[in-house]
């Protein structure tokens, strides 16, 4: 467009100069051959005097150029948002698709300076931020798809987390590798957020979530617990086997959650936890195991676990033995004391985000799926707790809107009934953003037509770039068919003629159609652009909004997730029992804690240090050192 403007200016100036010179020359010659030399000047007749002619010509030039510039800047070259070498059709007979015009964009969306926009950021157009207004009737579920390196975090996740914090809304983030916690935890705490991290990469740096505490004696929650665990750990098993396995796990969870005395036999510090379930399942022979719990159910036929245990006990002996053995293998991660610790204490309250503004980060591994069932459990019970709280309110909504940013969606694990959750959570003030790298990832998790239903439940889809054929074809089809004007020119000339002189020239115009975006155009889309599909609107093409342009970006102070010290970890240091020969006093204990704790500098907010269980960092004392004597050690 800049080149076009330059061509218009240059061409107009040159053309005006040539025209003035020609007219002046003609007028001068004509005046010389006139009857009295000056009485009949053709130049004066045409231009009403040279000075007046130049003024008139200049005014006309500025008027024409101004109209052209206005059309280019505010209306588009043709007013249809199309800047390719394509002439849209004059009718809708061949297709109605087109890019969203700027006029429609300004009516349907919030457009302006980032400081004046509080909605969900989609991108920028002509330097203005474009956002989905929060008061829009459309749901706020977003589907984001972009290949690796397409700026999913920089251009969508990070700026929209900043927007949510300005609105005072809670957020739950599936945080691959912990990058979002590292960049945003500190300033969110300064804004008054309750910040927690469920870190499945660095377990010592994770706050604890008592997953078995979600069950209590609720049979429905116990069923969900067993279903989610087995769905994430037992792919490919026969239906009868899965039925027995789920009921054994459900029965043991209910037994531990409801029977304090029995849980105490596991001899753990915190007894009614998932680690106890693992110990009880793997302790003793098969006959001893069955004898113990058959006796419990026989003596208490109204026990909440009776029905589940009966289904397991009704399987054949071989199936019962295999099921118990396999569950022990599936839950072997609880052999790790750190896994037991991060699932045993009630430091993360899943209902709290609906009550007050919270930011929970779930740090996921992008290298293995060992702890994937824990992240799946976390999000499954998060949905349950938030919906239960919302339904208990007079408005049937969360007091504080909750935003779920499910980055690397395929790494979270299976969420039971996710499609139903998408369709029902909007009215409860829960917004879900699903982020993936390519459509095949979603198709594997939700086969058949389910993946299409998932996307259909989101009124806004953002495509940041694609490198796979499936996604590119889907975007091309989603963009639709546009009508185009076809200009056809036919020329004929003698085959042996050395000079190109057409003998026949025909020009005709007709209507045709083409994809608004061909597959190859999706592949080759510039990385700085994104495509936004909004229900009821044409495709909108925007430039990506980099988070560094957001006003809150200057408040970012990076603190690695590995430096977080949860309460259970600090308590474990205080409970540390010395080994033989170890001298314990307050000085050594303080030194031990100091070595394990992160260094708190002026760059870390003191409140962050307090939440991490650290003492205030004193200012270093200034000491004077004299010259070192010969043979004296450098270290005092």
Locations of regions flagged by a protein language model:
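Intrinsically disordered, low-complexity N-terminal regions enriched in serine/proline/glycine
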Residues: 6, 47, 277, 292, ...
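Intrinsically disordered low-complexity regions specifically enriched for long asparagine
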Residues: 33, 482, 517-521, 620-622, ...
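Basic- and hydrophobic-enriched, low-structure N-terminal and domain-boundary segments
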Residues: 1-150, 154-160, 167, 507-510, ...
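A short glycine-/small-residue-rich loop at the edge of a beta-strand within enzyme catalytic domains
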Residues: 13, 106-109, 373, 409, ...
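P-loop NTPase motor domains
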Residues: 121-126, 133-430, 445, 520-541, ...
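Low-complexity, polar-biased intrinsically disordered regions enriched in Pro/Ser/Thr/Gly
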Residues: 112-113, 231-237, 261-269, 486-510
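Conserved ATP-driven motor cores of ASCE-family P-loop NTPases powering translocation/secretion/packaging/pilus
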Residues: 422-424, 428-531
């Amino acid at each position: 467009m800049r080149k076009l403007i330059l061509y218009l200016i240059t061409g107009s100036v040159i053309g005006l100069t040539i025209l003035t010179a020609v007219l002046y020359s003609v007028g001068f010659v004509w005046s010389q051959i006139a009857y009295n030399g000056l009485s009949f000047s053709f130049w004066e007749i045409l231009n009403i005097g040279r000075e007046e002619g130049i003024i008139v010509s200049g005014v006309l030039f500025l008027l024409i150029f101004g109209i052209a510039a206005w059309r280019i800047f505010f209306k588009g070259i043709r007013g249809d948002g199309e800047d390719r070498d394509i002439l849209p059709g004059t009718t809708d007979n061949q297709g109605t698709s087109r890019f969203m015009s700027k006029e429609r964009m300004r009516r349907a969306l919030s457009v302006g300076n980032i400081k004046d926009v509080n909605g969900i950021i989609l991108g920028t157009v002509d330097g203005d931020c474009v956002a989905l207004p929060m008061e829009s009737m459309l749901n706020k579920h977003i589907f984001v798809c972009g290949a690796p390196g397409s700026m999913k975090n920089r251009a969508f996740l990070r700026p929209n987390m900043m927007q949510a914090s300005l609105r005072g809304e809670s957020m739950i983030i599936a945080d691959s590798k912990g990058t979002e916690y590292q960049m945003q935890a500190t300033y969110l705490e300064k804004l008054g957020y309750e910040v927690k991290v469920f870190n499945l990469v660095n377990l010592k740096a994770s706050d604890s979530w008592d997953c078995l505490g979600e069950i209590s004696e609720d049979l429905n929650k116990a069923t969900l617990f067993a279903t989610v665990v087995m769905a994430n750990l037992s792919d490919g098993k026969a239906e009868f086997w899965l039925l027995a396995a789920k009921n054994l796990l459900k029965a043991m969870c209910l037994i531990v959650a409801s029977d304090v005395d029995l849980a105490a036999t596991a001899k753990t510090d915190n007894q009614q936890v998932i680690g106890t379930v693992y110990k009880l399942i793997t302790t003793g022979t098969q006959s001893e195991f069955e004898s113990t719990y058959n006796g419990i159910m026989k003596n208490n036929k109204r026990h909440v676990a009776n029905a589940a245990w009966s289904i397991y006990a009704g399987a054949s002996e071989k199936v019962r033995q295999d099921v118990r053995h396999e569950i022990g293998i599936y839950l072997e991660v609880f052999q790790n004391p750190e896994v037991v610790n991060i699932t045993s204490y009630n430091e993360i309250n899943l209902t709290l985000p609906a009550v007050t503004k919270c930011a929970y980060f779930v740090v996921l591994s992008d290298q293995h799926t060992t702890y994937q069932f824990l992240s799946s459990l976390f999000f499954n019970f998060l949905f349950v707790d938030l919906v239960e709280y919302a339904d208990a309110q007079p408005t049937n909504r969360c007091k504080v809107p909750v935003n779920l940013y499910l980055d690397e969606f395929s790494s979270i694990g299976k969420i039971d009934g996710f499609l139903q959750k998408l369709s029902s959570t909007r009215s409860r003030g829960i917004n879900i953003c699903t982020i993936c790298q390519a459509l095949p990832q979603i198709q594997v998790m939700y086969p058949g037509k389910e993946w299409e239903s998932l996307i259909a439940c989101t009124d806004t889809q953002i495509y940041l770039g694609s490198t796979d054929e499936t996604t590119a074809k889907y975007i091309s089809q989603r963009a639709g068919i546009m009508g185009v004007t076809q200009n056809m020119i036919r020329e004929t000339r003698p085959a042996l003629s050395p000079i190109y002189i057409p003998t026949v020239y025909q020009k005709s115009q007709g209507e045709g159609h083409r994809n608004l975006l061909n597959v190859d155009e999706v592949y080759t889309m510039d990385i700085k652009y994104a495509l936004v599909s909004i229900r009821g609107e044409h495709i909108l093409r925007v430039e990506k909004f980099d988070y560094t342009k957001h006003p809150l970006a200057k408040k970012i102070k990076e603190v690695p997730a590995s430096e977080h010290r949860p309460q259970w970890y600090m308590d474990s240091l205080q409970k540390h029992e010395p080994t033989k020969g170890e001298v314990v006093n307050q000085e050594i204990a303080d030194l031990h804690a100091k070595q394990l704790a992160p260094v708190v500098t002026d760059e870390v907010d003191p409140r962050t240090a307090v939440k991490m269980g650290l003492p205030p960092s004193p200012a270093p004392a200034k000491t004077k050192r004299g010259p070192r004597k010969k043979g004296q050690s450098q270290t005092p």
